[in-house]
Design a protein with these regions (language model features):
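N-terminal signal peptide c-region/cleavage motif recognized by signal peptidases
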Residues: 14-16
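Sec-dependent signal peptide recognition
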Residues: 1-8
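Compact alpha-helical subdomains of small soluble proteins
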Residues: 48-109
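N-terminal secretory signal peptides
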Residues: 19-57
Length: 109
């Protein structure tokens, strides 16, 4: 499942980070996907609905490409099973965030 998410994240994030022209810009560009990944996976693991996530994303006043990225991250997050206890939930959140950030950084190199 993580491999599928990794490939999905690369495909989703790559167009967003194409404009990054140096290592610092790459890190800055990758912070949005990383933070969004954490937010949507936290809601997923805490029992929030995907529909509510999509409504919240749609209400954000951000660039359309970032809104599209956020929607794709939410769909990917809800493809991961919800965990039954807080430690496993926290691990799933951290893993999803780390994979998103890593894949973004790889896409900018």
């Amino acid at each position: 499942m993580i491999r599928i998410l990794a490939v999905t994240a690369i495909l989703v994030i790559a167009p967003v980070v194409q404009a990054a022209d140096d290592n610092r810009a790459s890190k800055d560009v990758c912070m949005f996907p990383s933070q969004m990944a954490k937010a949507v996976m936290t809601q997923r693991q805490r029992g929030g609905s995907l529909a509510a996530q999509m409504e919240k994303i749609d209400s954000l006043e951000i660039q359309p490409v970032l809104k599209d990225l956020a929607r794709k991250l939410a769909v990917a997050a809800y493809g991961v099973p919800a965990q039954s206890n807080e430690n496993l939930q926290d691990a799933a959140i951290t893993e999803f965030q780390n994979q998103t950030y890593l894949n973004c950084l790889k896409g900018t190199q």
